[in-house]
């Protein structure tokens, strides 16, 4: 279930932050558009449990959506997934679907949501297949 905005951040606060940071840097570097997403490993999926990971992903992805809506000519939204060390990929599939419905064009898939413990199977393992199947079906719709 989607969570409400956390914390309550106004559009003006988002604009101010983006214009003094990301947009300023883009202009300084001569770029006019960027893929906008959190780094999967920096989102600390190994902290907390699956429910924490889901809420954290929803809140972050909702903020990314807002940024992309405020500056659609600059930010292309890419989502983070609620990966958690002991969770299967169902939560990630559900969040991917939610984000695709919001207009996201991609996602960050963390091959090691265990935070450096490498407890997950390699990306070629069947564990990942349900996610790949969903991703492929989405790609075919585009």
Task: Give, region by region, the residue ranges found by the protein language model.
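Helix-coil boundary/capping segments in enzymes
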Residues: 1-142
């Amino acid at each position: 279930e989607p969570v409400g905005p956390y914390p309550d951040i106004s559009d003006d606060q988002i604009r101010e932050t983006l214009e003094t940071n990301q947009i300023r840097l883009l202009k300084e570097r001569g770029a006019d558009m960027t893929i906008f997403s959190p780094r999967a490993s920096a989102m600390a999926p190994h902290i907390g449990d699956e429910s924490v990971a889901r809420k954290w992903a929803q809140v972050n992805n909702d903020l990314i959506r807002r940024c992309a809506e405020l500056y659609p000519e600059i930010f292309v939204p890419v989502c983070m997934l609620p990966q958690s060390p002991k969770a299967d990929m169902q939560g990630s599939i559900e969040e991917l679907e939610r984000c695709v419905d919001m207009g996201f064009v991609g996602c960050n898939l963390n091959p090691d949501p265990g935070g450096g413990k490498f407890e997950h199977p390699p990306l070629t393992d069947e564990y990942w297949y349900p996610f790949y199947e969903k991703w492929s079906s989405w790609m075919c719709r585009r």
